[in-house]
Amino acid sequence: SDRLLEITSELLKMSQVESGKLYLNPKITKPIELIDYAIKANRVQAERFNCQIEVEYPEKITKLFVDSEKIAWVVTNLLSNAIRYSSENGRIIIGARQIDKAVEIYVKDFGKGIDSRYHESIFDHYFRVPGTKVQGSGLGLAISKDFVEAHGGTIHIESEVGKGSTFVVRFNV
């Protein structure tokens, strides 16, 4: 029943984007608040998989002007995916960094990784990497991309099979 509720919620988010009824309520937000929210939201799942989550965060970083609810959802989804696709007793790094006039929030796992031929497709609605055994709707990354792009940001993956994946969300500041 939790899974059905999760899929229904994802479909609702997707329909808001597709119908042009995605409303943003931006406010000044510290990137660490988004990271902390994602960690708290995924705490039980991380404990169940015995995943170690490490946080990397600089002393000084520019605040973001974003809809914190939508971007917290994105970061939470990325961390949830990292936990689910990592091996048990896995290690995950979540953090933020400033590069020139941009702030990046990233989630890095050391799991199976994703073949480069799927790096673009994984952001398509309903796409699932062939052979994936982890349950999912194929909507989380698509919705994440929609939410990030609605803020003028970008999302991309850096991944190599057998070496894990890093998802990077970037906003100009």
Language model features with spans:
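Conserved catalytic submotifs in the C-terminal HATPase_c
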Residues: 25-30, 47, 52-62
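Short conserved segment of the HATPase_c
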Residues: 114-126
